[in-house]
Amino acid sequence: METLSFEFPAGQPPKGRALVGVVGSGDLEVLLEPGKPGTLSIQVVTSVNGAALRWQHLFERMFDGQTPPALSIDIHDFGATPGVVRMRLEQGFEEIGHD
C-alpha cells in the first residue's frame, strides 16, 4: 500500500459532499468534502506501488485549463484503471454540484 498526496489551485469550496464508488465492488472509492479555499487537496491510498506519476498525470489532465472547487478528496484505490478513476471523480463533482 502506498499513500500519495497532491495539491492543485482551486476556487471556493462547495457546500456539498459526496461518496462515490465502493472499494469492495470493483476497485475504487472516492470521498469529496469541502476544502480550504484556494486549494484542492487529494490523498490517494493505493494498492499499486510506484504509480505516483500515473496519478499526477491523470489529475493534471483533469484540471488543466479549469479551476476546480476547493475540495479535500480521499481516494481508496485497489487497482482501478485511469478511466474508472476519472469517471468516479466526475461523478463526485456532479454530485456535489446538486443541493
Swiss-Prot record:
The keyword tRNA-binding does not apply. Belongs to the MdcC family. Keywords: Cytoplasm, Phosphoprotein. It comes from Pseudomonas syringae pv. syringae (strain B728a). The modification O-(phosphoribosyl dephospho-coenzyme A)serine is found at residue 25. This is Malonate decarboxylase acyl carrier protein. One of its GO terms (cellular component) is cytoplasm. Subunit of malonate decarboxylase, it is an acyl carrier protein to which acetyl and malonyl thioester residues are bound via a 2'-(5''-phosphoribosyl)-3'-dephospho-CoA prosthetic group and turn over during the catalytic mechanism. GO terms for molecular function: acyl carrier activity. It is found in: Cytoplasm. The gene is mdcC. Signal peptide: none annotated. Covalently binds the prosthetic group of malonate decarboxylase. It comes from the Bacteria. Its main location: cytoplasm. InterPro entries: Mal_deCO2ase/Cit_lyase_ACP, Malonate_deCO2ase_dsu.
